[in-house]
Amino acid sequence: MMRPVIVMAGTPVDTQMGMDCLAAQGVEGVFCSISKDPVEQTAFQISSEREKAAVVTALFREAQAAHGCEQAFIYCNSLSGSVDFDAIARETGVAVVTPLDVYRALAPQYRSLAVIAANAQGAAGIERTLLLSNPDLTLRSAGILPVVLAIERGEEPEELVERHRLPELADWFAAQGAEALLLG
């Protein structure tokens, strides 16, 4: 029988989305939210590497002890880009999967991409991953925390997209040559 998987994200809403994603595949998750809201998450992401590693390592260790977890599913782009999960995986023995793993694999297929992330820390981590995988890639990015706050409040998607003028932003990225838009 498969052991439960740590589901970690920056906020409770994102963490629950990750839990729902795994549950749809019949996989049991262990809820591990880093912060209580996007503002606290951003503060966490700009804390020192040592502080971030200590918090994540402690949560991994708790899940290992309480639930026997051997794997972690990081369901948060900005968190993935701001924490060194490779080092934490080595230290804890937890196998970690993040969105950056997917981006690393996809980057060589493109010449130009656009990135919309929750904040600049998340965008920087995503860009670093993409450029390490494809140094010739042209990137344009935006960090838009108000969009994340609207999602957290449960704003209807159509209203959110219109209010934050996301179609215009996507059109601008496309006009600048972006072949695809990565929503981080």
Outline where the language-model segments fall.
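Non-catalytic structural scaffold of enzyme domains
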Residues: 1-184
